[in-house]
Amino acid sequence: MSKGLIHPSAIRSGLVDLEMAEETVDLVHKNLADSQAHLQGEPLNVDSLPEDMRKMRLTNAPSEREIIEEDEEEYSSEDEYYLSQGQDPMVPFQNFLDELGTQIVRRMKSGDGFFKIWSAASEDIKGYVLSTFMKPETQATVSKPTQTDSLSVPRPSQGYTSVPRDKPSNSESQGGGVKPKKVQKSEWTRDTDEISDIEGEVAHQVAESFSKKYKFPSRSSGIFLWNFEQLKMNLDDIVKTSMNVPGVDKIAEKGGKLPLRCILGFVSLDSSKRFRLLADTDKVARLMQDDIHNYMTRIEEIDHN
């Protein structure tokens, strides 16, 4: 008989569950009624809407819901140039940059100068942007100056007399300063290319040893390890600062191995407060002088041989 009895606590818990279920049903019914309240009222009058809202209509698409403006007068012809919907122009551009980065890494590993590689890469990027994103000029605008130039060229008359070579004409005297400018420009370009090659060699060797740690004397009469990564600097800034180290440009011009520990110490003393706190500056200065002297001696021996 005791097995068939139901405990009063089970009855009370069952009643509580029933009450909670009823409350849940009421809450769901209320939410449904609130969400459909706009369907129970009067329909909206389009004329009562703001002017901007009256110009728009809703269309049901199979994949998404689009809002289309009915006012076609504000349509701009410039929008025809851009890609259609669903085509992201950044996807092919990102693929182009990935391929370009792979080529840059491959060329740096082969020993090419950094600035020479970057000049070629920048031209590739400019060409891609101009051909993909920029709008080409129309032929009408190009043909106009061509026609005016052809009409403005005077034809030689029958009374034309040749000018002796020892007496230059006015046009030659006016354009006499053009040739020296071209010579100066070529000389400046040649000097710039030489500087770019030297800086590119420095950047190449520094980049190869960016994470390599070098030993420096510390203030506690010991040593500590330091590398280029701890400077938190760009490679271009490191190269510009390292060009102030005496003899670095000559060693890079000869294609020799650079005193990277000396360069790291010089740049760190100039740019890193943490390095100045850790290092014994006097010992670091002597260490840098010894490195420069040893590397310059090797270069001189190679030149003599």
Curated annotation (Swiss-Prot):
Transmembrane segments: none annotated. GO terms for cellular component: host cell cytoplasm; host cell nucleus; virion component. A motif (Nuclear export signal) lies at residues 49-58. Phosphorylated by host PKC and by an unknown kinase. The keyword Iron-sulfur does not apply. It comes from the Viruses. Residues 139-151 have a biased composition (Polar residues). Pfam families: PP_M1 (PF03012). The keyword Chaperone applies. The modification Phosphoserine is found at residues 63, 211, 272. A motif (Nuclear localization signal) lies at residues 212-215. Belongs to the lyssavirus protein P family. Non catalytic polymerase cofactor and regulatory protein that plays a role in viral transcription and replication. Stabilizes the RNA polymerase L to the N-RNA template and binds the soluble protein N, preventing it from encapsidating non-genomic RNA. Also inhibits host IFN-alpha and IFN-beta signaling by binding and retaining phosphorylated STAT1 in the cytoplasm or by inhibiting the DNA binding of STAT1 in the nucleus. This is Phosphoprotein. It comes from Lagos bat virus.
